Structure formats: C-alpha cells, structure tokens
Amino acid sequence: VPIRKVQDDTKTLIKTIVTRINDISHTQSVSSKQRVTGLDFIPGLHPLLSLSKMDQTLAIYQQILASLPSRNVIQISNDLENLRDLLHLLAASKSCPLPQVRALESLESLGVVLEASLYSTEVVALSRLQGSLQDMLRQLDLSPGC
C-alpha cells in the first residue's frame, strides 16, 4: 500500500471520528479547557506530536472510552483502534519502532471517578479527544517524526 494512501486514509478517519463526536450532541456543553476535578488523567492538547505520542494518546483515550458504559462511544473506540493501526503503518514506513503502550496506572482510579461523574467524564474525554485529533490532523501535514 502506498504510504500516501495510508496518510490520506489516516486523515479521513480522523475527520470521521471528529464528526462522530460532533454528532453526540451533549459533547458541546463542556469546554475542553474546563477543569473537572479528578479528570487530570485525560490527555490535554500536545501541539508537537510524534507518531509514538499520537499512538500513546489514542491508547489512553481507548482505555477511557472502553470504561464508559455509554453506547455512544463504542464506534469511536473501534475507530481509534483502526486509527492506531494506520499510525503503526505510517511509523513502519519511517522505520519507527512504536513502543508497546501499557495500561496507565492513573486509569486504575478511573472507576471511582466514573461512579462520581460519569456524564462529565464522557463529555470531557470526547471534547479533549476531538481537540487532540484536530492537532494530529495538522501534525500529519507536517510529516511527523517517530
């Protein structure tokens, strides 16, 4: 598969995920910059992203979305898996070794946070994910390093 096609597919999938997040109406009700106590483990924005940082960020969001009971996020979680596969292809084309992403210790406390503020967790996670994806889209145009 030509790497240009992989890069185009990656960008298209990112745009699709952003659209899916927009379609979940309640995600518009919280600013991604809003501080919600206990949700510091949800990644914020990283202006300069390498392929490995993108993969790591997506892995964290996958773990968070997998722990949410909302059916809204199932397709988005599947899309993130596919997006990570595309990033792995891009990384392989540049001979970048992507480290295995391990479960985050900070997510072990996720259950407690979810019980306290399920709705807020979903809204903040999706809002920040959307911002991160838009950052990744911009970064892919700059041909990110490993």
Curated annotation (Swiss-Prot):
GO molecular-function term, one example from the UniProt record: peptide hormone receptor binding
KW Protein biosynthesis (keyword) present: no
A single BP term in Gene Ontology: regulation of cell cycle
Keyword Secreted among UniProt keywords: yes
Disulfide bonds: 96-146
N-terminal signal peptide: none
PANTHER family on file: LEPTIN
Function per UniProt: Key player in the regulation of energy balance and body weight control. Once released into the circulation, has central and peripheral effects by binding LEPR, found in many tissues, which results in the activation of several major signaling pathways. In the hypothalamus, acts as an appetite-regulating factor that induces a decrease in food intake and an increase in energy consumption by inducing anorexinogenic factors and suppressing orexigenic neuropeptides, also regulates bone mass and secretion of hypothalamo-pituitary-adrenal hormones.
This protein's name: Leptin
Source species of the chain: Ovis aries
Gene (UniProt): LEP
